[in-house]
Amino acid sequence: MTRPTWDQYFTKIVKVTSERSSCERLHVGCVLVKDNRIISQGYNGFLPGCKHNSIVRDNHEQATVHAEQNALMDCAKRGVSCNNSTAYITHYPCIICTRLLLAAGIKEIKYLTDYKNDELVANFCEQCNTIICKLL
């Protein structure tokens, strides 16, 4: 058996992380990695402590927190810096999550699945010298 590459390893982990999602429409996971060590994980789900009441507007769930946001908030709560780290995400990030990842100092975004790929995401990454790439 061959040893998986780091990308293969974290790809498996982010897929399993997404399985924790309580969202019926889409299961998204995010794993933040620094120096090949996981510093945080998150998945999309309802607000902590709140009932799982779905509120959909314009085909988008309003009552959930995105996976990337949950991973970043976990770092903030625990006082862990994610500066110069890599985000492994199951789906192409939205504009808001991209802005948050970039503001937090994420230097590489690796995603598995195309999802409403907005050109602003790539534009913001380029402006911030952050690599965004799809893993096969």
For each feature predicted by the language model, list its residue ranges.
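Zinc-dependent deaminase catalytic domain
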Residues: 1-136
